[in-house]
């Protein structure tokens, strides 16, 4: 793989700015290379203003939503939060429930059984709510509802007001709800569109607190949940999202929530980062619950639980469920690789798979990993009800997934999602025809990114330049995530020692002992053994390795890409 590096001089405006002039030159250089132009843009990245996000108003129907919730609180009406079962829906529900209850609300929460009703507010869900809580007067959705025409109509017939907060793409029309808050509405003029569901929940609760003249800082304590959701849902980290994740990561680091402290203890978390801890520790453990067919109510109660002992017990259970999820994921990945080997197509334009043993809650992970490995659109189906199969789909730059799937209405029983990720249901008998049709659409769209596309380097360094201070300065750029990745470095090093690690010695560590720098390449053992001499150039991300009081610089190399 060929990596490109573009050097852009640091603008003089930045260097004369009284605040930016005190910022590490490396940090400014990375931002200049990434195309930032003005001092104001850079200040927004480095010093996000969370108060501005909380105060920002203007989303359509937000006033109506707040007015109805205010009336429900004052009239002691039952409110039920109808949430999705993924991290975004769970965290968004937590934000709403804990804040509404803090404001005196009579609040319950409900999510579909993903194996029965799938995604989104539906008539059966409304029926279940009314059976459990027949006094319900308001249903407040989070992370779903924008295409829930039947579900909203079912609630309307029962005299229940529906307040929708969602971030998915709407259709040509909106459901006939009391209020519909979605920054992606066709008639929306709000300047920011890329919220996750929990981000909208945070804005809704802050708007409600202002209307009721409550302390908005109480709502701000829920920023940790909005950050967790934003990272998990892979929304772009720019604008208000970046500010929310920045503040939420700070709250997570403080450990204000007993549930987070319990997760940190169980998983031995020393430092919380959005791109590390949130993405690869918290989010998978929370997502595993619904993926493995467990009740998400346990997770929401856990996130709001004040008792340390109960939190630790639930954290251990979450860890156990996640280990089961990992085992099932590995099994389905192995089957997928065998199926692809049987197809004998080393350079597929897309991947479409189905297996009777796949689980609906796991295929999204498998699709994502296959997409990352082959860099093509991937759709993986699992059995649904008799005669139907349901898939999770993941795409690459160049193919808008939801637009492409909408071009196949003759096959899709149900379909929804985004440009990069979608879910769909088809008749099992149509699988082969659907696969052929989708493959043809991918073939016709020659703008799909292929494997020769590489991310740009942020800087090129020599091992002699690296030290603890250098690496720590990069934390000023956090949080990292979608649209604002962790800095990628080109590194030149004088390797004088090579060590093989892990089961089967399949990993390799290259060491420049003179400069106390090491480079780890996961899965690179066989490639390293095949070379007569170790490489001297690497590409990867820098971090500090702290062990027994000693600190050294470590690069995690892009796998096989040097």
Task: Please describe what each predicted stretch is.
Residues 2, 8-138, 158, 209-433, ...:
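Hydrophobic helix-and-loop "lid/oligomerization" segment in the mid-to-C-terminal part
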Residues 95, 174-214, 219-231:
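Short alpha-helices
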Residues 142-195:
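Histidine/acidic-residue-rich, glycine-tolerant segments that coordinate divalent metal ions
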Residues 353, 509-513, 554-558:
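Short, acidic/hydrophobic/Gly-rich beta-strand patch recurrent on exposed beta strands
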Residues 409-414, 440-447:
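A common structural junction motif
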Residues 430-435, 527, 531-562:
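OB-fold single-stranded nucleic acid-binding module
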Residues 459-517:
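Accessory interdomain/linker segments of ATP-dependent helicases and helicase-like nucleic-acid enzymes
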Residues 514-530:
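Beta-strand/loop nucleic-acid-binding surfaces
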């Amino acid at each position: 793989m060929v990596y490109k590096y573009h050097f852009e001089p640091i603008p003089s405006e930045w260097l004369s700015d009284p605040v930016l002039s005190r910022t590490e030159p490396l940090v400014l250089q990375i931002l200049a290379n990434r195309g930032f132009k003005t001092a104001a843009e850079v200040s927004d990245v480095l010093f996000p203003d969370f108060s501005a996000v909380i105060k920002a108003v203007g989303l359509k129907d937000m006033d109506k939503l707040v007015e109805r919730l205010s009336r429900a609180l004052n009239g002691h009406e039952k409110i039920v939060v109808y949430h999705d079962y993924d991290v975004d829906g769970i965290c968004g529900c937590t934000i709403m429930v804990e804040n509404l209850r803090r404001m005196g609300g009579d609040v319950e929460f409900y999510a579909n059984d993903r194996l029965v009703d799938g995604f989104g507010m539906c008539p059966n869900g409304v029926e279940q709510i009314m059976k459990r809580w027949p006094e319900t007067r308001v249903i407040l959705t989070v992370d779903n509802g924008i295409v829930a025409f039947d579900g909203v109509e079912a609630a309307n017939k029962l005299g229940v007001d529906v307040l929708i907060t969602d971030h998915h793409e709407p259709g040509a029309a909106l459901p006939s709800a009391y209020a519909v808050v979605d920054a992606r509405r066709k008639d929306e003029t709000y300047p920011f569109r890329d919220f996750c569901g929990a981000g909208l929940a945070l804005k809704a609760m802050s708007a409600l607190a202002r209307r009721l003249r409550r302390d908005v800082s109480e709502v701000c304590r829920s920023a940790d949940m909005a950050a967790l959701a934003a990272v998990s849902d892979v929304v772009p980290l720019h604008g208000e999202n970046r500010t929310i994740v920045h503040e939420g990561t700070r709250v997570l680091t403080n450990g204000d929530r007993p549930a987070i402290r319990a997760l940190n203890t169980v998983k031995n978390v020393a430092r919380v980062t959005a791109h590390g801890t949130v993405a690869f520790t918290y989010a998978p453990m929370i997502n595993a619950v619904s993926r493995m067919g467990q009740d998400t109510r346990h997770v929401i109660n856990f996130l709001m639980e004040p008792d340390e002992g109960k939190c630790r017990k639930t954290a251990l259970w979450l860890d156990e469920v996640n280990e089961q999820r990992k085992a099932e994921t590995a099994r389905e990945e192995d089957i997928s690789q065998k199926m692809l080997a049987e197809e004998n197509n080393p350079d597929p334009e897309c991947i479409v798979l189905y297996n009777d043993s796949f689980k609906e809650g796991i295929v999204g992970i498998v699709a994502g990993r296959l997409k990352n490995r082959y860099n093509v659109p991937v759709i993986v189906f699992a059995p649904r009800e008799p005669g139907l199969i349901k898939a999770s789909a993941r795409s690459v730059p160049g193919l808008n997934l939801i637009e492409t799937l909408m071009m196949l209405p003759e096959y899709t029983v149900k379909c929804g999602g985004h440009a990069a990720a979608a879910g769909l249901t088809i008749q099992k008998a149509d699988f082969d025809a659907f696969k052929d049709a989708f493959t043809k659409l991918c073939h016709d769209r020659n703008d799909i990114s292929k494997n020769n596309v590489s991310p740009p380097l942020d800087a090129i360094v020599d091992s002699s330049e690296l030290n603890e201070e250098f690496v720590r300065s990069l934390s000023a750029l956090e949080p990292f995530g979608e649209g604002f990745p962790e800095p990628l470095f080109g590194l030149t090093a004088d390797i004088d020692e090579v060590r093989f690690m892990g089961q089967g010695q399949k990993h390799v560590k290259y060491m420049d002992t003179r400069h106390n720098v090491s480079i780890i390449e996961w899965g690179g053992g066989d490639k390293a053994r095949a070379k007569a001499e170790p490489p001297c150039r690497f590409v990867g991300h820098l971090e500090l390795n702290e062990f027994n009081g000693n600190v050294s610089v470590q690069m995690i190399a892009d796998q096989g890409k040097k």
